[in-house]
A protein has these predicted regions:
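Extracellular loop and loop/strand-boundary signature of outer-membrane beta-barrel proteins
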Residues: 23, 66-71, 106-115, 152-162, ...
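Hydrophobic, lipid-facing positions within transmembrane beta-strands of outer-membrane proteins
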Residues: 34-37, 79-83, 123-127, 169-173, ...
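Structural signature of outer-membrane beta-barrel domains
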Residues: 23-25, 55-59, 101-104, 145-149, ...
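Short sequence motifs at beta-strands and strand-loop junctions characteristic
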Residues: 29-31, 75-77, 119-122, 163-167, ...
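Outer-membrane beta-barrel "beta-signal"
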Residues: 277, 308-322
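Outer membrane beta-barrel
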Residues: 1-104, 121-137, 176-190
Length: 322
C-alpha cells in the first residue's frame, strides 16, 4: 500500500491511499486486487472521502483475529466505492455516506451481480454517530439498500417490462474499549438483505402478477452479534465469539434469493495467541463454527427441521510489517 500526504487545498489537508493484495480471482487465483483507493480532504472538524475503502458497517470497530474473514458473517465485511462525509464536534462524530458496489455484490435472481444496484439507480445510504472519549468508542448506524432485481419477465413466451424494487433498512450498534493492555470490542447488527457485506440473508418472493410476471419481495432479516477480547502487549491471548440468528421475513414467501437462506443459526468461537514485536507478528488460532441447516418455512421465511454441521479450523500466521 501507499499513503500520500499532499499540499493543502484551500483550508483542507489532502491525503490519498492506494492498497493492493493478491486475493483477487478471475480466470485464476491469487491475482492482484484493489483494496483501497481514495482521496481525503480534512478541514479539522470535518472531512470528505472520495473513493473505495471500508464499508461504514465495517467501520472503526472490527475484531482482531488472524482469520482473513475478519469475523464475517457476524461482522460486516466489504470495501466499496463511496462518498463519505464526517463531522466532529467535541467527542461526537457524525458520518454520512453514499455507496456503490464493486467487488462485494448483492445476491439476486442471477446470483451475485452489480446489475441490481445499477438498475436501481439508487446508492446505498449510511448514517451513523459515534462517541469517542480517550480509549472508549460507542456508536450506532443505519443503512439503506434499494435494489431492482429484474427489469423484465417472461410469461407464456411473452416478455414484459416490469418495475421491481426491494428496499430494506439495517441497524447496528458497536463499542470498543482500548487501553495499554486491553482491547474489548463488540458489535450487533439487525440486518436486512446485507449480502453485499459478506453476511447471510437476502429476500424472498411474496407475490407474482400472473399476467406480467412482476414480483414483489420481502427482505430476510438476520440478527448477528460478536465480542472480541484481547489482552497483553508482546504475548497477546485473545478470544472471539459470534452468533447469528435467522429471523425470517415479514411476509409469506415462495422462493428465496440470497446467501445462507437455509441456515437457521450460526455459532462461532475462536481462541488465539500471538507474539508481537516491532515489524513482526506470529500467531496461532483455533476456530470452531457450527451451522444449523434446514428447510424453508414459506409462511414466515424462517428455517425449520434443522440439523447442525460443525467445522474446525486451525490458522498459523507469520506477518512481517514494514
Amino acid at each position: 500500500g501507499l499513503d500520500v500526504q499532499g499540499p493543502k487545498l484551500g483550508n483542507a489537508k489532502t491525503s490519498a491511499k492506494v492498497e493492493l493484495d493478491f486475493r483477487g480471482s478471475g480466470t485464476t487465483f491469487s491475482v492482484v486486487r484493489l483494496r483501497h483507493a481514495y482521496l481525503n480532504l480534512d478541514w479539522g472538524t470535518s472531512a470528505l472521502l472520495l473513493g473505495q475503502t471500508w464499508h461504514p458497517l465495517y467501520g472503526d470497530v472490527a475484531p482482531q483475529i488472524l482469520n482473513l474473514n475478519m469475523g464475517a458473517p457476524f461482522q460486516p465485511f466489504s470495501r466499496a466505492p463511496q462518498i463519505r462525509y464526517r463531522y466532529k464536534t467535541g467527542d461526537i462524530q457524525i458520518t454520512g455516506a453514499a455507496l456503490w458496489q464493486s467487488q462485494y455484490l448483492s445476491q439476486g435472481p442471477e446470483g451475485k451481480s452489480q446489475k441490481y444496484i445499477k438498475n436501481s439507480c439508487v446508492p446505498e445510504i449510511y448514517a451513523g454517530i459515534d462517541y469517542k472519549h480517550k480509549g472508549l468508542l460507542i456508536g450506532a448506524g443505519i443503512e439503506m439498500v434499494s435494489l431492482t432485481p429484474r427489469t423484465q419477465a417472461t410469461v407464456e413466451d411473452k416478455i414484459y417490462k416490469v418495475s421491481e424494487r426491494i428496499t430494506s433498512l439495517s441497524y447496528e450498534v458497536h463499542m470498543k474499549y482500548n487501553s495499554e493492555k486491553w482491547l474489548v470490542a463488540a458489535k450487533s447488527v439487525l440486518g436486512s438483505n446485507l449480502t453485499q457485506t459478506s453476511m447471510l440473508g437476502g429476500y424472498g418472493i411474496k407475490s407474482i402478477d400472473p399476467r406480467t410476471g412482476e414480483q414483489e419481495y420481502s427482505p430476510n432479516r438476520n440478527s448477528s452479534s460478536w465480542i472480541n477480547i484481547v489482552y497483553g502487549k508482546t504475548w497477546k491471548p485473545a478470544i472471539f465469539f459470534g452468533y447469528m440468528k435467522n429471523l425470517g421475513t415479514s411476509d409469506a414467501v415462495t422462493n428465496m434469493y440470497g446467501t445462507g437462506t437455509n441456515v437457521d443459526q450460526l455459532l462461532s468461537g475462536t481462541a488465539e495467541l500471538t507474539y508481537n514485536v516491532p515489524h513482526w507478528k506470529l500467531g496461532v488460532e483455533y476456530n470452531l463454527t457450527s451451522a444449523w441447516y434446514g428447510s424453508l418455512n414459506h409462511s414466515n421465511g424462517k428455517v425449520v427441521d434443522t440439523h447442525s454441521v460443525s467445522n474446525n479450523r486451525l490458522v498459523a500466521t507469520a506477518l512481517f510489517m514494514f
